[in-house]
């Protein structure tokens, strides 16, 4: 699966650290399981019981009496604990470094993937949602690896080392521990299967609850104006009740699992004592062996009782894993196509072009040419496909037939390379919570203050900036000044012209600008001789006579020509005259 490969590739820079982590884990768990054995031999030596270990017997033979064995054993225990503490400290540092690098690499790969998604996938999924969801999902996976993976690794290693030691003691005592552990494992598997759909439903219910709360806050003015508060409260209670019901099922399941497993753990120790007393009475095992058996049994079974929490984290992790895998399945833009282009001839040619969106033909049989430095306006009624036409030009939609920029066929080019030569200004203003100057400098950081003032004056924005206390250093957005929609659109125009491109597209970019400023800006742009093609999408068809060429979209077809020529088309003439009546001829 794609996310699995991405996770593995995100860990490749930490191979050495992972190896160190595993080696330290082996050392820690081995010494942890060997400490009870040292105590066992210590007890058995003091009680004059049989010690079936050649190395320990040799070690004991070095001392003249038992009392001299006591401080040496204590030193050995403290030294072992010291090694465990030091190894644990180094392992923690190593793990944190692995997690830090892994989290950074994984988020970087996912963010890079999101940035390169096709326009269709961006359209279906909000960028903010994609980034936020992927960040949350990465955090879930990282938290599982950081907190639970170490626990699982230690558990596996403890079982391996402990079973080896128990096998040397007594098989009957080992059976009690093994049976108790198997019952807990079976219960854990049952819990895993039962909790999986509950956790998935819980996440879904929590998301619905969050969405409802967010909608209520976002639309609070609308609800107040229309007295919808009580209805919204009812809907909120319904969503909250659904969330509560799912949570209640989870609580019942957790309570049952924990009750059974804790009962098994509590029953296990008395059972071992009873069996041990018979074995001890018959001289089969020693007191030290009983201690070791109980110690190991409690270590293993108590570790398994925490398996429910691990499995809950695992289920949550799997939900995130699936979501990230679905994210990575989204289509990327064609990175393998030619991206080493520089458009010298900005002639745009549509020849027998058909544009489809989600399988539906929006525009068909498009045939027209836009020459360099030509001022073109694209008009048509709402929904006629004006924006789709030019978004296809920059690679947002697929098409049949031919659409060329100069000698290059658009569908054969890398989308990023196309957009390096085309500037698309949308109706929405995309600004950052920075100063006005910083927003203007995003494309060209080295632009000078006089150049900013000159461009701002060109787009009738400088006089507005002068009214702010901090001028171009005024912060916009949160805790800053509030720009009107028209001011935002003018700021975006200034920013775009810090780095003009061979083809400039204005997709209803003046919609919020007042009529006087709109006329001044349009006159400035139309009189600007900078060898760039300028294409305007607008509902203001009354502006058509100002342009070199008009492309009129109607019922999926396109007509192109000068204003006087298109007046022969009845639909165009009707649309033009209707708009002219609304605004008055003095605006034209």
Question: What are these regions, as identified by a protein language model?
Answer:
Residues 17-30, 77, 83, 150-201, ...:
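Transmembrane helices of ABC transporter permease
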Residues 18-87, 167-172, 284-287:
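Transmembrane helix-loop-helix hairpins at lipid-water interfaces of multipass membrane proteins
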Residues 95, 115-159:
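Juxtamembrane loop-to-helix connectors within ABC transporter transmembrane domains
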Residues 108, 326, 402-404, 412, ...:
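ABC ATPase nucleotide-binding domain helical subdomain, centered on the C-loop/LSGGQ "ABC signature"
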Residues 123-128, 201-251, 321:
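Loop segments that connect adjacent transmembrane helices in multi-pass transporters
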Residues 205, 224, 228, 252, ...:
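Cytosolic ends of transmembrane helices, especially the final helix of ABC transmembrane type-1 domains
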Residues 393-395:
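Helix-to-loop junction immediately C-terminal to a conserved catalytic motif
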Residues 523, 527, 531, 545-588:
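C-terminal portion of ABC ATPase nucleotide-binding domains
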């Amino acid at each position: 699966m794609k996310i699995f490969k991405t996770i593995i590739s995100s860990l490749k820079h930490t191979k050495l650290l992972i190896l160190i982590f595993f080696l330290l884990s082996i050392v820690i768990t081995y010494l942890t399981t060997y400490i009870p054995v040292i105590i066992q031999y210590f007890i058995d030596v003091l009680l004059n019981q049989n010690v079936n270990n050649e190395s320990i017997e040799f070690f004991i033979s070095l001392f003249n009496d038992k009392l001299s064995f006591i401080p040496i054993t204590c030193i050995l225990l403290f030294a072992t604990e010291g090694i465990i503490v030091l190894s644990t400290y180094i392992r923690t540092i190593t793990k944190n470094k692995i997690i830090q690098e892994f989290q950074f690499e994984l988020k970087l790969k996912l963010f890079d993937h999101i940035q390169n998604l096709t326009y269709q996938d961006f359209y279906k999924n909000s960028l903010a949602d994609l980034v936020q969801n992927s960040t949350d999902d990465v955090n879930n996976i990282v938290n599982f690896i950081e907190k639970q993976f170490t626990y699982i690794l230690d558990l596996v290693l403890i079982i391996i080392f402990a079973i080896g030691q128990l096998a040397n003691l007594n098989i009957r005592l080992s059976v009690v521990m093994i049976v108790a552990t198997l019952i807990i494992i079976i219960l854990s598997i049952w819990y895993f299967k039962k909790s999986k759909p509950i956790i998935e439903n819980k996440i879904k219910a929590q998301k619905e609850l969050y969405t409802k709360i967010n909608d209520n806050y976002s639309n609070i003015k609308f609800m107040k104006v229309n007295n919808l508060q009580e209805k919204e409260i009812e809907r909120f209670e319904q969503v909250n009740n659904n969330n509560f019901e799912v949570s209640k099922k989870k609580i019942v399941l957790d309570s049952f699992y924990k009750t059974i497993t804790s009962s098994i753990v509590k029953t296990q120790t008395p059972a071992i004592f009873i069996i041990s007393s018979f074995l001890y009475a018959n001289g089969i095992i020693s007191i030290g062996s009983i201690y070791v058996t109980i110690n190991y049994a409690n270590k293993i079974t108590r570790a398994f009782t925490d398996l429910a929490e691990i499995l809950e984290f695992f289920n949550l992790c799997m939900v995130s894993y699936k979501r990230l895998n679905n994210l990575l399945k989204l289509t990327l833009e064609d990175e393998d196509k030619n991206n080493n282009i520089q458009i010298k001839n900005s002639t745009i040619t549509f020849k027998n072009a058909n544009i489809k969106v989600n399988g539906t033909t929006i525009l068909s049989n498009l045939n027209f040419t836009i020459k360099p430095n030509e001022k073109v306006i694209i008009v048509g009624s709402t929904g006629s496909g004006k924006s789709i036409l030019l978004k296809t030009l920059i690679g947002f939609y697929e098409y049949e037939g031919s659409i060329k920029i100069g000698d290059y066929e658009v569908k054969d080019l890398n989308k990023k390379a196309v957009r390096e030569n085309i500037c698309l200004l949308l109706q929405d203003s995309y600004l950052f919570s920075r100063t006005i100057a910083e927003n203007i400098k995003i494309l060209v950081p080295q632009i000078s203050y006089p150049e900013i003032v000159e461009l701002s004056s060109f787009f009738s924005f400088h006089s507005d900036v002068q009214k702010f206390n901090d001028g171009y250093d005024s912060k916009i957005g949160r805790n800053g000044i509030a720009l009107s929609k028209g001011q935002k659109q003018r700021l975006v125009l200034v920013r775009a012209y810090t780095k003009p491109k061979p083809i400039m597209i204005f997709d209803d970019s003046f919609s919020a600008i007042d009529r006087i400023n709109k006329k001044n800006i349009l006159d400035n742009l139309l009189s600007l001789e900078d060898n760039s093609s300028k294409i305007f999408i607008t509902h203001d068809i009354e502006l058509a006579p100002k342009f070199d060429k008009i492309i009129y979209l109607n019922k999926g077809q396109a007509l192109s020509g000068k204003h006087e020529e298109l007046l022969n088309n009845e639909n165009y003439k009707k649309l033009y005259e209707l708009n002219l009546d609304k605004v008055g001829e003095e605006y034209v």
